[in-house]
Amino acid sequence: QGEAQLLAEDGLQGQLRIGASDTICRYFLIDYLKRFHQDYPGVRIKVTNSTSMGCVELLENRQVDLIVSNLPNSRLTSHTKTYVVKNFRDIFVANPEFFPFEGKTLEIKKMMEYPLLTLSSKSTTSEYLHQFFASHRQNLIPEVELNSNDLLVDLARIGLGIACVPDYMLSSLHGQEASLIHVNLKQQLPARQLALVYHENLPLSQAAQKFFDYFSAKSTTTASF
């Protein structure tokens, strides 16, 4: 009984509750969830989808055991523990038929002359981009703000603008990104991280600990926020 987290004769039982954004689920987390399901078929996996900011709220409300979040994330508190599991960069992509910038490097001020496609203002990515542009004395006003990186790529592909998306996403599209080019920015965007996050006052369930173990051996840093 209890939380049904005992080791039964046929393996680990219980539930794994995890929160992550669309992009993180699809382009990073899915392979780990597949492996976990194969290793522990007796564990029920519940994935709750939200922005990285929204996932912090899920964690604070004890609706999930773990979240995978972009860093930096201004919503994280001193009660959360983070383990970095991946470094990545955000890149600008566009259709060269509409934006012939291949082999060129744009100044950030020049980039502002073109329609920019970004995630919505309620995301860590938007917060990060606005801070970056502000640090170069530019006020970022996107042409389009969406809740989906996949849709941003689709709009960039048909020439509606220059989209900002994480590099690991494009590396997973298996050739579909061939119609897009990387638009080089002279002032390079700082690297960001993906991190496993849990609440220090809430002990991890046995299932959550097993999932965490997939990453802890290769974790690049441990920090409190």
Locate each region found by the language model.
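A late-sequence structural motif
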Residues: F28, H182-F225
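Central regulatory/effector-binding core of bacterial HTH transcription factors
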Residues: Q13-L76, L146
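Short loop->beta-strand "edge-of-pocket" segments that line small-molecule binding or catalytic clefts
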Residues: R17-G19, D90, L106-S126, S219
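Secondary-structure junction motif
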Residues: P100-E102, P115-H136, L204-A208, F212, ...
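Alpha-helical linker/hinge and terminal dimerization helices associated
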Residues: Q1-D10, T222
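Short beta-strand->loop
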Residues: K81-I91, Q176-P190
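Flexible hinge/capping segments at coil-to-helix
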Residues: H79-L116
